[in-house]
Amino acid sequence: MGSSFQFFDIIFFALIAAFVILRLRSVLGKRTGHAQRDSDSYQTEPLGAGLTQIQVADPGFDPADFVAKANSAFEYIVATFAAGDADKLKPLLSKDVFAGFESAINDRAEKEHVLETELVRIKEAEFLEANMSGRTASIKIKYTTEQINVTLDEDGEVIDGDPDRIAEVVDIWTYERDTQSSNPNWVLVATETLQ
């Protein structure tokens, strides 16, 4: 009897997802072909289905609001990592990600190196994946940014990077959140730098 309830739950949520997608399409309108491609890449079907699953589990979830807050988190985490403040990073990162960040911060401190990072701008923040696994929502974002990254030694001499060069950096960050938790914050659970 329990499996028949699960079957009906799946059907029920699939119908809700289909309804939400149809409503979104009617509200958002159609492209004329003259519009520029925007960063609302979450309109693709598999990604849209994942975002819809998250919205069903967390009715307060808004993809545009998520990207705005994720961009702010990206800026804050990059700046805080460069400043070497592990204590401020800890509540924002999973245990594994925090361990990697803390290790890099400690390694810099032992060598008396200083990382100077200037995030010039976020060119694009693009949804790559969104899904639900049990109660946990997971979203993967691809950030294309312009940054100046310089590492200085204990004498203030540049040992890595160029203070006059703006580099394009592509990062993929994965955020997760327990949708049944009263804590509204997402946690950074994975990072990958492509360039």
Each model region followed by its residue ranges:
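Juxtamembrane and targeting peptides
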Residues: G2-S72, Y76, T151-D155
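Generic detector of bulky aromatic hydrophobic side chains
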Residues: F5, F19, Q53, F81, ...
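Short alpha-helical basic/polar micro-motif
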Residues: L22, D87, W173
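Core segments of small alpha/beta cavity-forming domains
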Residues: P46-A130
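Structured, amphipathic secondary-structure segments that form assembly/contact surfaces
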Residues: P91-Q195
